């Protein structure tokens, strides 16, 4: 009878959630979401924090709704997305890496009791990548360098989406800030907004293309022999990935802060590009890539 009661109580606890203290770890459905979500899952698990994995749950609206509803407890989000969560997209604060992070943290804590932990240094925003041979030969590292190179007659032909080429916030903003202008002959507009296509065009030098519209941490950048030009004047909003966690959960498991901080601190642009590339290009499983990275950095055993 005692065993029957215990079993019934356990079943009730599972249904109500009253006795289940597992931290539900989730992420977005894209490649980087899979890598980052699995990093969080692996590190918490290695730290003896009980977890349940719901990695690559869906797009931004799905995971956002899930965490505000308490259906998941932690997932990696991008600082720049808070501009749209809170209808502040016109503010320049999102172009400053630190100020944008602080504003996101402040708004989400007040509105939703969500805590933003320290973000990675990597910035997954709109960018321009150039073939590495050209960048190395001309010492091109930043958008200021690229602007001077183009303005001085440097041979650049860029593949991009129609939105990137025409949106005032994208290529036109880069051109006005960095003092260059690409003619129609220097542009190849590809349908859709797929950076895989623009990267492939630059890698294969399709129609003479040697530069591409990218997102900063795209996994195909490095394997395709491209290098991202740093947006040194902060033209674009900054999208730094950071774990966000329900405050109630963080109060129960405060060690989450300490164990995740060194993980995200190691995720610079080049590191995330390589990790994403192992999944996108190399075909490895996101969890295997995450685990291998954490072990190689001494963050888990």
Language model features with spans:
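Bacterial N-terminal signal peptides that target proteins for export
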Residues: 1-8
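Sec/Tat signal peptide C-region and signal peptidase I cleavage site
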Residues: 16-21
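Short, polar/charged alpha-helical segment
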Residues: 31-50, 172, 176-178
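Short helices/loops that flank or line small-molecule/ion binding pockets
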Residues: 42-43, 61-72, 88, 177, ...
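Glycine/small-residue-rich interface belts in oligomeric ring/scaffold proteins
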Residues: 51-90, 94
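Contiguous mixed-secondary-structure segments that line small-molecule binding/active-site clefts
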Residues: 79-172, 176, 180, 184, ...
């Amino acid at each position: 009878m005692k065993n029957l009661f215990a079993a019934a109580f356990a079943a009730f606890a599972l249904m109500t959630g009253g006795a289940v203290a597992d931290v539900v770890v989730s992420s977005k459905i894209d490649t980087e979401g899979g890598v980052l979500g699995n990093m969080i899952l692996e590190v918490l698990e290695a730290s003896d924090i009980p977890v349940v994995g719901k990695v690559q749950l869906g797009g931004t609206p799905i995971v956002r709704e899930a965490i505000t509803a308490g259906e998941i407890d932690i997932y990696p989000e991008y600082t720049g997305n808070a501009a749209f969560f809170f209808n502040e997209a016109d503010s320049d604060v999102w172009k400053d890496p630190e100020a944008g992070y602080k504003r996101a943290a402040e708004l989400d804590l007040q509105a939703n009791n969500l805590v933003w932990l320290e973000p990675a240094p990597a910035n997954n925003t709109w960018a321009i990548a150039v073939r590495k041979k050209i960048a190395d030969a001309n010492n091109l590292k930043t958008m200021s360098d690229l602007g001077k190179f183009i303005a001085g007659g440097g041979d650049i032909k860029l593949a991009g989406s129609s939105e990137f080429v025409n949106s005032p916030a994208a290529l036109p903003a880069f051109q006005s800030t960095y003092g260059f202008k690409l003619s129609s002959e220097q542009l190849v507009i590809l349908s859709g907004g797929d950076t895989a296509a623009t990267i492939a065009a630059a890698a294969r030098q399709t129609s003479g293309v040697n530069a591409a519209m990218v997102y900063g941490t795209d996994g195909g950048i490095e394997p395709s022999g491209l290098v991202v030009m740093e947006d040194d004047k902060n033209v674009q909003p900054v999208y730094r990935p950071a774990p966000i966690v329900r405050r109630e959960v963080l109060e129960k498991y405060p060690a989450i802060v300490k164990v995740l901080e060194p993980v995200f601190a190691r995720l610079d642009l080049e590191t995330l590009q390589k990790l994403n590339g192992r999944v996108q290009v190399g075909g490895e499983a996101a969890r295997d890539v995450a685990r291998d990275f954490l072990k190689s950095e001494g963050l888990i055993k």
